[in-house]
Amino acid sequence: MAAAAVVEFQRAQSLISTDRNASIDIFHSIVRRDVQEDDEEAVRVKEQSILELGSLLAKTGQAAELGGLLKFVRPFLISISKAKAARLVRSLLDLFLDMEAATGQEVELCLECIEWAKAEKRTFLRQALEARLISLYFDTKRYQEALQLESQLLQELKKMDDKALLVEVQLLESKTYHALSNLPKARAALTSARTTANAIYCPPKLQAALDMQSGIIHAAEEKDWKTAYSYFFEAFEGYDSIDSPRAVTALKYMLLCKIMLSLPEEVQALISGKLGLRYAGRQTDALKCIAQASKNRSLADFEKALTEYTKELRDDPIINTHLAKLYDNLLEQNLIRVIEPFSRVQITHIAGLIKLSKNDVERKLSQMILDKKFHGILDQGEDVLIIFEEPPVDKTYEAALETIQNMSKVVDSLYNKAKKLT
């Protein structure tokens, strides 16, 4: 029995690269077969077949079948050790969730697995699955549910010795707070995660995720694009080493850093480099177009890129946030350059020069006047912008402050001398 299963398993493996469907059918037949608990070889072959079948179903995009496999193998999991069962469940669930197939059953399937782990009294597996559920809540923007589960799970994990899972949950906490724009708490959670990670060996995937979040926090909170770039580069190398689809996201953020550092010419060099060529596609093309628009200071090209690559740019909250600021800066620079030669100019003329709608231009000019980016007024009756000369800086206030500071020093000196005499 076991010998026949081994032969079938080897045949299925040999067909993976040439005939995936035939390989899947053979693995299916091995997985469906009942095995005796005391037949170690047959149990081992069935374990490996489950993992191989799960991997093939994920690669061929068969999300529903993979979800079904996860439910089907539960009776078999009771007959093997808790550690092996936990590894199988986590591996299959990770494969299912990493597919990002958006079947709508992800949360439901994860909750089912958690209930099964509770019923079987498998605490470590339940905690690992709850961490995966937090990640799902985060991906589906259910942030309050994520924070609630994070709080409960962190209390448990701090009393136990599973440091790797603790790092994972602390990292998820940082991501959740960042998504809620609570940067101080996001930074604190990330610091806790990195401190915990320093005491253990971090798998490449987890280390890359830590580096990615560090780059995001540096970019969001401190606008420290050089440091953010170095973190994104580390994350990119980490994800690339394990062939993770997240590598292209890290590469996108690297390109974003170059654009925000006013180095758009370096974007092409990164994309055409040895590592960049491997990930060439719409994701990198989108940032390439933004870099070109930034280099040419062209708002029209910028708008065109945002329209053409909506999914790649607008749907990524990190990219979208920073590109909105970049667009705003670019618009201000263009407006200041256009109005510089004038003391009085029609708003429609400005809109025509920078190829934007009159309402958008009028709104931005109003904001710039309020922010004191230049001195002027909008005459809406005449539909013109009137620009004033830069008023001379009144130095009376600065001179008064300097005088008061000098007088304070004199008084302090006299006080010290009088104190010595007494």
Swiss-Prot record:
Gene3D superfamilies linked: 1.25.40.570
Any one of the GO BP annotations: stem cell differentiation
Domain PCI: 228-392
Superkingdom of the source species: Eukaryota
SMART domains assigned: PAM, PINT
Pfam families in the record: PCI, RPN6_C_helix, RPN6_N
Name used for this protein in its record: 26S proteasome non-ATPase regulatory subunit 11B
Organism: Danio rerio
Lineage, top ranks: Eukaryota, Metazoa, Chordata, Craniata, Vertebrata
Gene that encodes the chain: psmd11b
